[in-house]
Amino acid sequence: MDDGRGAGGFGGGPAVRALDTEAVHAGRDDLARQGLHAAPIDLSTTYPSYDSRAEAARIDAFAADGAEPAGPPVYGRLGNPTVARFETALARLEGTDSAVAFASGMAALSAVLLVRNAMGLRHVVAVRPLYGCSDHLLTAGLLGSEVTWVDPAGVADALRPDTGLVMVESPANPTLAELDLRALAHACGSVPLLADNTFATPVLQRPAEHGARLVLHSATKYLGGHGDVMAGVVACDEEFARGLRQIRFATGGVLHPLAGYLLLRGLSTLPIRVRAASSNAAELARRLAADPRVARVHYPRIGGAMIAFEVYGDPHEVIAGVRLITPAVSLGSVDSLIQHPASISHRIVDAADRRGAGVSDRLLRLSVGLEDVEDLWADLDGALGTDRLPETAGAGREPSRTALRLPERAADR
Protein backbone atom coordinates (compact mmCIF):
# COMPACT_ATOMS: atom_id res chain seq x y z
CA MET A 1 0.00 0.00 0.00
CA ASP A 2 1.33 3.40 -1.00
CA ASP A 3 1.92 5.78 1.90
CA GLY A 4 1.19 8.99 0.04
CA ARG A 5 4.79 10.00 -0.64
CA GLY A 6 4.38 9.73 -4.40
CA ALA A 7 2.93 12.60 -6.38
CA GLY A 8 2.29 14.53 -3.21
CA GLY A 9 5.46 13.43 -1.45
CA PHE A 10 8.71 15.18 -0.67
CA GLY A 11 10.41 14.85 -4.04
CA GLY A 12 8.92 15.57 -7.44
CA GLY A 13 5.60 16.58 -5.94
CA PRO A 14 3.07 19.06 -7.26
CA ALA A 15 3.70 22.75 -7.63
CA VAL A 16 3.66 24.80 -4.46
CA ARG A 17 0.10 24.92 -3.17
CA ALA A 18 -1.67 27.14 -0.67
CA LEU A 19 -1.71 26.00 2.94
CA ASP A 20 -5.44 25.29 2.84
CA THR A 21 -4.98 23.04 -0.18
CA GLU A 22 -2.03 21.21 1.35
CA ALA A 23 -4.00 20.64 4.54
CA VAL A 24 -6.65 18.78 2.55
CA HIS A 25 -4.49 16.94 0.01
CA ALA A 26 -0.97 16.39 1.42
CA GLY A 27 -0.39 12.74 2.23
CA ARG A 28 -3.39 11.78 0.09
CA ASP A 29 -2.32 12.65 -3.47
CA ASP A 30 -1.99 8.99 -4.44
CA LEU A 31 -5.44 7.91 -3.29
CA ALA A 32 -7.41 8.58 -6.48
CA ARG A 33 -4.94 6.54 -8.54
CA GLN A 34 -5.60 3.63 -6.19
CA GLY A 35 -9.35 4.00 -6.50
CA LEU A 36 -9.64 5.37 -2.97
CA HIS A 37 -11.15 8.52 -1.55
CA ALA A 38 -10.44 8.22 2.20
CA ALA A 39 -7.01 7.19 3.47
CA PRO A 40 -6.89 3.55 4.59
CA ILE A 41 -5.95 2.51 8.13
CA ASP A 42 -3.24 -0.16 8.20
CA LEU A 43 -3.36 -1.82 11.63
CA SER A 44 -0.77 -4.50 10.87
CA THR A 45 2.07 -4.89 13.32
CA THR A 46 4.11 -7.13 11.02
CA TYR A 47 4.30 -7.78 7.29
CA PRO A 48 4.99 -11.06 5.43
CA SER A 49 8.17 -11.57 3.43
CA TYR A 50 9.49 -14.73 1.80
CA ASP A 51 12.92 -13.23 1.14
CA SER A 52 14.80 -13.19 4.44
CA ARG A 53 18.05 -12.11 2.80
CA ALA A 54 16.42 -9.01 1.37
CA GLU A 55 14.82 -8.25 4.74
CA ALA A 56 18.21 -8.55 6.43
CA ALA A 57 19.70 -6.10 3.94
CA ARG A 58 16.91 -3.58 4.50
CA ILE A 59 17.24 -3.81 8.28
CA ASP A 60 21.02 -3.41 8.05
CA ALA A 61 20.53 -0.32 5.89
CA PHE A 62 18.11 1.20 8.41
CA ALA A 63 20.52 0.53 11.27
CA ALA A 64 23.29 2.20 9.31
CA ASP A 65 21.60 5.42 8.24
CA GLY A 66 18.00 5.57 9.52
CA ALA A 67 16.52 6.02 6.05
CA GLU A 68 13.05 4.60 5.71
CA PRO A 69 13.27 1.03 4.37
CA ALA A 70 12.58 0.85 0.65
CA GLY A 71 9.80 -1.43 -0.48
CA PRO A 72 6.95 -2.85 1.57
CA PRO A 73 6.72 -2.34 5.34
CA VAL A 74 8.68 -4.65 7.64
CA TYR A 75 7.48 -4.21 11.21
CA GLY A 76 5.35 -1.67 13.05
CA ARG A 77 8.23 -0.09 14.94
CA LEU A 78 10.08 0.51 11.68
CA GLY A 79 7.18 2.41 10.19
CA ASN A 80 3.52 2.27 9.27
CA PRO A 81 1.88 3.44 6.01
CA THR A 82 -0.96 5.28 7.76
CA VAL A 83 1.40 7.11 10.10
CA ALA A 84 3.64 7.90 7.13
CA ARG A 85 0.77 9.73 5.47
CA PHE A 86 0.43 12.00 8.48
CA GLU A 87 4.19 12.57 8.56
CA THR A 88 4.17 13.49 4.87
CA ALA A 89 1.32 15.93 5.35
CA LEU A 90 2.76 17.63 8.43
CA ALA A 91 6.17 18.06 6.78
CA ARG A 92 4.53 19.77 3.82
CA LEU A 93 2.55 22.09 6.08
CA GLU A 94 5.66 23.05 8.07
CA GLY A 95 7.84 23.33 4.97
CA THR A 96 10.41 20.72 6.00
CA ASP A 97 11.89 17.70 4.24
CA SER A 98 10.54 15.18 6.72
CA ALA A 99 8.57 14.60 9.88
CA VAL A 100 8.75 11.80 12.43
CA ALA A 101 5.73 10.99 14.59
CA PHE A 102 5.72 9.63 18.13
CA ALA A 103 3.27 8.42 20.75
CA SER A 104 3.28 11.81 22.51
CA GLY A 105 4.91 15.20 22.41
CA MET A 106 7.17 14.24 25.29
CA ALA A 107 8.26 11.09 23.44
CA ALA A 108 9.13 13.31 20.49
CA LEU A 109 11.20 15.70 22.61
CA SER A 110 12.90 12.79 24.35
CA ALA A 111 13.92 11.37 20.99
CA VAL A 112 15.46 14.70 19.95
CA LEU A 113 17.52 14.79 23.16
CA LEU A 114 18.62 11.18 22.74
CA VAL A 115 19.77 11.83 19.17
CA ARG A 116 22.02 14.65 20.37
CA ASN A 117 23.15 12.79 23.49
CA ALA A 118 24.28 9.87 21.34
CA MET A 119 26.63 12.31 19.58
CA GLY A 120 28.09 13.50 22.89
CA LEU A 121 26.16 16.78 22.67
CA ARG A 122 24.35 16.68 26.00
CA HIS A 123 24.18 20.40 26.74
CA VAL A 124 20.92 22.23 26.01
CA VAL A 125 20.32 25.98 26.04
CA ALA A 126 16.68 26.81 26.69
CA VAL A 127 14.47 29.86 27.13
CA ARG A 128 11.64 29.90 29.66
CA PRO A 129 8.77 29.50 29.76
CA LEU A 130 8.32 26.12 28.14
CA TYR A 131 5.59 23.56 28.65
CA GLY A 132 5.95 22.37 32.25
CA CYS A 133 6.91 18.78 31.44
CA SER A 134 9.46 19.94 28.85
CA ASP A 135 10.97 22.17 31.53
CA HIS A 136 11.06 19.26 33.97
CA LEU A 137 12.62 16.84 31.48
CA LEU A 138 15.47 19.28 30.89
CA THR A 139 15.91 20.45 34.48
CA ALA A 140 15.86 16.98 36.04
CA GLY A 141 18.36 15.63 33.52
CA LEU A 142 16.34 12.44 33.19
CA LEU A 143 17.97 11.61 29.86
CA GLY A 144 21.44 12.78 30.81
CA SER A 145 21.05 16.27 29.42
CA GLU A 146 22.39 19.41 31.12
CA VAL A 147 20.41 22.59 30.63
CA THR A 148 21.37 26.26 30.82
CA TRP A 149 18.39 28.59 31.12
CA VAL A 150 18.85 32.00 29.51
CA ASP A 151 16.98 35.03 28.26
CA PRO A 152 16.77 35.20 24.46
CA ALA A 153 19.62 37.71 24.34
CA GLY A 154 21.88 35.29 26.20
CA VAL A 155 21.66 32.34 23.83
CA ALA A 156 24.88 32.96 21.91
CA ASP A 157 26.97 33.44 25.06
CA ALA A 158 25.59 30.23 26.59
CA LEU A 159 26.70 27.98 23.74
CA ARG A 160 29.46 25.47 24.47
CA PRO A 161 31.35 22.93 22.36
CA ASP A 162 29.03 20.21 23.70
CA THR A 163 25.80 22.17 23.12
CA GLY A 164 23.53 20.00 21.04
CA LEU A 165 20.32 21.98 21.05
CA VAL A 166 18.68 25.33 21.71
CA MET A 167 15.02 25.00 22.68
CA VAL A 168 12.34 27.67 22.67
CA GLU A 169 8.57 27.88 22.51
CA SER A 170 6.82 30.75 20.76
CA PRO A 171 4.15 31.67 21.59
CA ALA A 172 5.18 30.28 24.94
CA ASN A 173 3.14 28.06 27.21
CA PRO A 174 1.38 29.53 29.14
CA THR A 175 2.31 33.23 28.97
CA LEU A 176 2.09 33.48 25.16
CA ALA A 177 5.37 35.41 25.09
CA GLU A 178 6.71 35.65 21.54
CA LEU A 179 10.31 35.33 20.42
CA ASP A 180 12.19 36.49 17.34
CA LEU A 181 12.90 33.07 15.85
CA ARG A 182 15.05 34.41 13.04
CA ALA A 183 17.31 36.26 15.49
CA LEU A 184 17.52 33.19 17.70
CA ALA A 185 18.42 30.96 14.76
CA HIS A 186 21.21 33.38 13.88
CA ALA A 187 22.45 33.33 17.49
CA CYS A 188 22.51 29.53 17.45
CA GLY A 189 25.04 29.35 14.64
CA SER A 190 25.49 25.68 13.75
CA VAL A 191 23.59 24.45 16.81
CA PRO A 192 20.07 23.28 15.90
CA LEU A 193 17.23 25.50 17.06
CA LEU A 194 14.16 23.55 18.19
CA ALA A 195 10.97 25.61 18.19
CA ASP A 196 7.86 24.24 19.84
CA ASN A 197 5.12 25.34 17.45
CA THR A 198 2.21 23.69 19.26
CA PHE A 199 0.37 26.93 20.05
CA ALA A 200 0.82 28.64 16.68
CA THR A 201 0.56 25.67 14.30
CA PRO A 202 1.79 26.09 10.72
CA VAL A 203 -1.36 28.10 10.05
CA LEU A 204 0.08 31.08 11.96
CA GLN A 205 3.84 30.53 11.68
CA ARG A 206 6.36 28.12 10.18
CA PRO A 207 9.52 28.18 12.29
CA ALA A 208 11.57 26.46 9.59
CA GLU A 209 11.12 29.56 7.43
CA HIS A 210 12.82 31.55 10.19
CA GLY A 211 15.79 29.22 10.55
CA ALA A 212 14.62 26.63 13.07
CA ARG A 213 16.00 23.22 12.16
CA LEU A 214 13.51 21.32 14.32
CA VAL A 215 9.80 22.04 14.79
CA LEU A 216 8.10 20.24 17.66
CA HIS A 217 4.38 19.67 18.11
CA SER A 218 2.28 18.09 20.74
CA ALA A 219 -0.02 16.75 18.04
CA THR A 220 -2.50 15.99 20.81
CA LYS A 221 -3.49 19.63 20.60
CA TYR A 222 -4.41 21.52 17.41
CA LEU A 223 -3.19 18.97 14.87
CA GLY A 224 -5.66 16.40 16.18
CA GLY A 225 -8.03 19.10 17.30
CA HIS A 226 -10.75 17.06 18.96
CA GLY A 227 -9.28 15.92 22.28
CA ASP A 228 -9.31 12.25 21.30
CA VAL A 229 -5.77 11.43 20.18
CA MET A 230 -2.36 11.66 21.89
CA ALA A 231 0.70 12.14 19.72
CA GLY A 232 3.84 14.13 19.06
CA VAL A 233 5.80 14.94 15.93
CA VAL A 234 9.08 16.58 14.91
CA ALA A 235 9.27 18.27 11.51
CA CYS A 236 12.86 18.58 10.34
CA ASP A 237 15.40 17.91 7.60
CA GLU A 238 15.86 14.34 6.42
CA GLU A 239 19.30 13.99 8.03
CA PHE A 240 17.93 14.64 11.52
CA ALA A 241 14.83 12.57 10.78
CA ARG A 242 16.99 9.51 10.21
CA GLY A 243 18.37 9.71 13.72
CA LEU A 244 14.88 10.19 15.13
CA ARG A 245 13.61 7.08 13.34
CA GLN A 246 16.45 5.03 14.79
CA ILE A 247 15.66 6.27 18.30
CA ARG A 248 11.96 5.57 17.79
CA PHE A 249 12.72 2.03 16.67
CA ALA A 250 15.03 1.43 19.63
CA THR A 251 12.84 2.97 22.33
CA GLY A 252 9.42 2.03 20.96
CA GLY A 253 7.66 5.39 21.20
CA VAL A 254 5.68 4.69 18.04
CA LEU A 255 2.39 6.29 17.07
CA HIS A 256 -0.60 3.95 16.76
CA PRO A 257 -1.95 3.77 13.18
CA LEU A 258 -5.45 4.81 14.26
CA ALA A 259 -3.93 7.92 15.85
CA GLY A 260 -2.09 8.57 12.59
CA TYR A 261 -5.37 8.39 10.71
CA LEU A 262 -7.11 10.75 13.12
CA LEU A 263 -4.24 13.22 12.86
CA LEU A 264 -4.27 13.13 9.07
CA ARG A 265 -7.99 13.82 9.16
CA GLY A 266 -7.44 16.57 11.72
CA LEU A 267 -4.96 18.34 9.46
CA SER A 268 -7.58 18.66 6.74
CA THR A 269 -9.60 21.09 8.88
CA LEU A 270 -6.65 22.65 10.74
CA PRO A 271 -6.62 26.02 8.92
CA ILE A 272 -10.34 26.65 9.23
CA ARG A 273 -10.40 25.52 12.88
CA VAL A 274 -7.43 27.67 13.88
CA ARG A 275 -8.76 30.77 12.13
CA ALA A 276 -12.26 30.43 13.55
CA ALA A 277 -11.03 29.79 17.09
CA SER A 278 -8.53 32.65 16.75
CA SER A 279 -11.31 35.04 15.79
CA ASN A 280 -13.20 34.03 18.94
CA ALA A 281 -10.06 34.38 21.05
CA ALA A 282 -9.22 37.85 19.74
CA GLU A 283 -12.70 39.07 20.66
CA LEU A 284 -12.57 37.50 24.12
CA ALA A 285 -9.11 38.99 24.68
CA ARG A 286 -10.47 42.45 23.87
CA ARG A 287 -13.30 42.06 26.33
CA LEU A 288 -11.08 40.65 29.06
CA ALA A 289 -8.59 43.49 28.60
CA ALA A 290 -11.36 46.01 29.25
CA ASP A 291 -12.79 44.15 32.25
CA PRO A 292 -11.98 45.65 35.68
CA ARG A 293 -11.91 42.16 37.22
CA VAL A 294 -8.94 41.24 35.03
CA ALA A 295 -5.48 42.52 35.92
CA ARG A 296 -3.62 41.59 32.74
CA VAL A 297 -4.27 39.87 29.43
CA HIS A 298 -1.66 38.09 27.34
CA TYR A 299 -2.47 37.57 23.66
CA PRO A 300 0.14 37.10 20.93
CA ARG A 301 0.70 39.52 18.08
CA ILE A 302 0.43 36.70 15.54
CA GLY A 303 -3.02 35.88 16.89
CA GLY A 304 -4.11 32.40 17.85
CA ALA A 305 -6.73 30.65 19.91
CA MET A 306 -4.91 30.83 23.26
CA ILE A 307 -5.41 33.54 25.88
CA ALA A 308 -3.67 33.91 29.23
CA PHE A 309 -5.08 36.34 31.76
CA GLU A 310 -4.46 37.26 35.37
CA VAL A 311 -7.35 38.03 37.69
CA TYR A 312 -7.58 40.21 40.78
CA GLY A 313 -9.70 37.63 42.56
CA ASP A 314 -9.14 33.95 43.28
CA PRO A 315 -8.34 32.11 40.02
CA HIS A 316 -9.59 28.86 41.52
CA GLU A 317 -13.03 30.41 41.89
CA VAL A 318 -13.04 31.24 38.20
CA ILE A 319 -12.19 27.63 37.37
CA ALA A 320 -14.98 26.42 39.64
CA GLY A 321 -17.44 28.88 38.13
CA VAL A 322 -17.37 27.94 34.45
CA ARG A 323 -20.27 25.92 33.07
CA LEU A 324 -19.83 25.90 29.28
CA ILE A 325 -16.04 26.04 29.17
CA THR A 326 -14.45 22.78 30.32
CA PRO A 327 -12.09 23.09 33.33
CA ALA A 328 -9.35 20.78 32.09
CA VAL A 329 -5.71 20.65 31.11
CA SER A 330 -4.69 20.37 27.43
CA LEU A 331 -5.72 22.71 24.63
CA GLY A 332 -6.39 23.01 20.94
CA SER A 333 -9.71 21.20 20.89
CA VAL A 334 -12.92 22.30 19.17
CA ASP A 335 -14.35 23.02 22.62
CA SER A 336 -12.96 25.63 25.01
CA LEU A 337 -10.79 24.59 27.95
CA ILE A 338 -9.52 26.58 30.93
CA GLN A 339 -6.91 25.68 33.53
CA HIS A 340 -4.67 27.15 36.23
CA PRO A 341 -1.05 26.58 35.11
CA ALA A 342 0.49 26.99 38.56
CA SER A 343 -1.69 24.11 39.76
CA ILE A 344 -1.58 21.78 36.77
CA SER A 345 0.45 22.20 33.57
CA HIS A 346 3.39 23.96 35.25
CA ARG A 347 3.07 22.57 38.76
CA ILE A 348 6.12 20.39 38.16
CA VAL A 349 8.30 23.48 37.62
CA ASP A 350 9.96 24.96 40.71
CA ALA A 351 7.76 27.76 42.03
CA ALA A 352 10.51 30.38 41.90
CA ASP A 353 11.45 29.42 38.34
CA ARG A 354 7.81 29.38 37.36
CA ARG A 355 7.12 32.86 38.71
CA GLY A 356 10.38 34.15 37.28
CA ALA A 357 9.20 33.09 33.84
CA GLY A 358 6.01 35.11 34.25
CA VAL A 359 3.69 32.30 35.32
CA SER A 360 2.01 34.02 38.24
CA ASP A 361 -0.25 32.30 40.73
CA ARG A 362 -3.20 34.33 39.41
CA LEU A 363 -2.67 33.38 35.78
CA LEU A 364 -5.34 31.40 33.93
CA ARG A 365 -4.86 29.79 30.52
CA LEU A 366 -7.84 29.66 28.17
CA SER A 367 -7.91 27.54 25.03
CA VAL A 368 -10.70 29.03 22.94
CA GLY A 369 -12.81 26.70 20.84
CA LEU A 370 -15.45 27.01 18.17
CA GLU A 371 -18.47 27.86 20.29
CA ASP A 372 -20.38 31.08 19.72
CA VAL A 373 -18.34 33.91 21.17
CA GLU A 374 -21.34 35.39 23.00
CA ASP A 375 -21.96 32.09 24.80
CA LEU A 376 -18.30 31.91 25.76
CA TRP A 377 -18.31 35.47 27.07
CA ALA A 378 -21.46 34.85 29.09
CA ASP A 379 -19.77 31.87 30.74
CA LEU A 380 -16.57 33.81 31.49
CA ASP A 381 -18.50 36.79 32.77
CA GLY A 382 -20.42 34.61 35.19
CA ALA A 383 -17.30 32.78 36.34
CA LEU A 384 -15.44 36.03 36.99
CA GLY A 385 -18.27 37.02 39.34
CA THR A 386 -19.45 40.37 40.61
CA ASP A 387 -17.65 40.37 43.96
CA ARG A 388 -14.09 40.11 42.67
CA LEU A 389 -13.35 43.70 41.78
CA PRO A 390 -10.11 45.18 43.12
CA GLU A 391 -10.44 48.20 45.36
CA THR A 392 -8.52 50.30 42.85
CA ALA A 393 -10.52 49.13 39.85
CA GLY A 394 -12.81 51.49 38.09
CA ALA A 395 -13.22 53.79 35.17
CA GLY A 396 -10.01 54.96 33.61
CA ARG A 397 -7.99 51.88 34.49
CA GLU A 398 -5.77 51.12 31.52
CA PRO A 399 -5.42 47.37 31.05
CA SER A 400 -1.92 45.95 30.82
CA ARG A 401 -1.90 43.75 27.77
CA THR A 402 -0.14 42.86 24.57
CA ALA A 403 -1.32 44.07 21.19
CA LEU A 404 -4.56 42.46 20.10
CA ARG A 405 -5.43 41.74 16.50
CA LEU A 406 -7.03 39.07 14.41
CA PRO A 407 -4.64 36.51 12.88
CA GLU A 408 -3.74 36.94 9.26
CA ARG A 409 -4.26 34.26 6.68
CA ALA A 410 -1.03 32.30 6.41
CA ALA A 411 -1.23 32.57 2.63
CA ASP A 412 -1.08 36.37 2.93
CA ARG A 413 2.20 36.41 4.84
Swiss-Prot record:
What is the recorded name of this protein? L-methionine gamma-lyase
Listed under catalytic activity are: L-methionine + H2O = methanethiol + 2-oxobutanoate + NH4(+); L-homocysteine + H2O = 2-oxobutanoate + hydrogen sulfide + NH4(+) + H(+); L-cysteine + H2O = hydrogen sulfide + pyruvate + NH4(+) + H(+)
EC number from the UniProt entry: 4.4.1.11, 4.4.1.2
**Residues binding substrate, per UniProt:** Y131, R365
Write out the ranges of the annotated region (Disordered): 388-413
Q: Which SUPFAM superfamilies match?
A: PLP-dependent transferases (SSF53383)
Instruction: List residues, modification N6-(pyridoxal phosphate)lysine.
Output: K221
Organism of derivation: Streptomyces avermitilis (strain ATCC 31267 / DSM 46492 / JCM 5070 / NBRC 14893 / NCIMB 12804 / NRRL 8165 / MA-4680)
Taxonomy of the source species? Bacteria, Bacillati, Actinomycetota, Actinomycetes, Kitasatosporales
Functional description taken from the UniProt entry: Catalyzes the alpha,gamma-elimination of L-methionine to produce methanethiol, 2-oxobutanoate and ammonia. Is probably involved in L-methionine catabolism. Is also able to catalyze the alpha,gamma-elimination of L-homocysteine, and, to a lesser extent, the alpha,beta-elimination of L-cysteine.
Needed co-factor(s): pyridoxal 5'-phosphate
Record GO biological process: cysteine biosynthetic process via cystathionine; transsulfuration
| Keyword Lyase listed | yes
Q: Which family does it belong to?
A: Belongs to the trans-sulfuration enzymes family.
- Assembly and interactions? Homotetramer; dimer of active dimers.
